[in-house]
Amino acid sequence: MSAAGAGAGVEAGFSSEELLSLRFPLHRACRDGDLATLCSLLQQTPHAHLASEDSFYGWTPVHWAAHFGKLECLVQLVRAGATLNVSTTRYAQTPAHIAAFGGHPQCLVWLIQAGANINKPDCEGETPIHKAARSGSLECISALVANGAHVDLRNASGLTAADIAQTQGFQECAQFLLNLQNCHLNHFYNNGILNGGHQNVFPNHISVGTNRKRCLEDSEDFGVKKARTEAQSLDSAVPLTNGDTEDDADKMHVDREFAVVTDMKNSSSVSNTLTNGCVINGHLDFPSTTPLSGMESRNGQCLTGTNGISSGLAPGQPFPSSQGSLCISGTEEPEKTLRANPELCGSLHLNGSPSSCIASRPSWVEDIGDNLYYGHYHGFGDTAESIPELNSVVEHSKSVKVQERYDSAVLGTMHLHHGS
């Protein structure tokens, strides 16, 4: 003990123990826990002597009691008027620093309850929790943390208490302090916001059947397209089945090029097609048909999609319809049980507009005007509202053909009449 040797050198001829007993009787009583001697001395000692520092460590009697864990002596000194937050002249250390370094949690807790400042730094910028980390006292660290000690404070060398414990080899204390630091850093990140992360700005994207082009409904500020307001999206009527997860369904929404759909040769009106279409991946799918006397019918059964999304009908149950597919001659074809077409057509608009189901070029188009009108594919970017309803086009085509047959019959009759 170099400090004690220096003190003994000052008083030549005296041992450190003799010097302590003669010159600093209060300090000696606190070291040994001699409560009777301490109480007797406190009755005779002036109040100013309670703050006197020894020549060995530069401690007051309170520091001695705290370092050696003499709680009864500490209590008597404070009752006699000793100051809790008194700092030493040499290192500016309080009794809380000394108790933490000595590894005495009982004394430390009592000092805290009596009003000691546990975040006061010493001359090296260290608080009591740094001293507890140096001594490896997990009990003192826990007591300090439980009473509001700051675990993230750094000393003059830039080290936290966790760094000091790690340097001294106290792994358990270091890990405990590191966990506390991480907990403290994450304390302000709540409501699903992670450290360094962001909140989901699109909370409504979990709707399974939502079209990818329309899923960002409330994001006008981000420059994306607003959703249509005419009707509810199909996702409310399209449940997840077969245990498919949200991620699986979301993967099905990846935009792809629209496949060419089988020609709608002599098909029925689009209203029947839209009515009997089934929902796959959030879009309307229009089932393919088998040729019937050289014609293809679009009226068929709605099947469950491959990803478990159905239109609400039981599998195998044909969609009820009061009429079959109309041929050019006006006769009805019986309804058939059909299979879903794996090739989906463009489905930007699901409100019955033609761009939801127009093929590359309908095979029933004959004249040059119709060819020009349907000369391009109505897919992404087309405004369906600017295109006339397909029912009207079909009806017009049928009317023209009927008129041509009527004119042909009239001309034939006139030729026969005049020829005879």
From Swiss-Prot:
One of its GO terms (cellular component) is nucleoplasm. It holds the Pfam family Ank_2. One of its GO terms (biological process) is protein targeting to chloroplast. Keywords: ANK repeat, Repeat. One of its GO terms (molecular function) is chloroplast targeting sequence binding. InterPro entries: Ank_Repeat/CDKN_Inhibitor (IPR050776), Ankyrin_rpt (IPR002110), Ankyrin_rpt-contain_sf (IPR036770). It comes from the Eukaryota. ANK repeats lie at residues 21-50, 57-86, 91-120, 124-153. Transmembrane segments: none annotated. The keyword Repeat applies. PANTHER family: ANK_REP_REGION DOMAIN-CONTAINING PROTEIN, ANKYRIN REPEAT DOMAIN-CONTAINING PROTEIN 42. This is Ankyrin repeat domain-containing protein 10. It comes from Homo sapiens. The gene is ANKRD10.
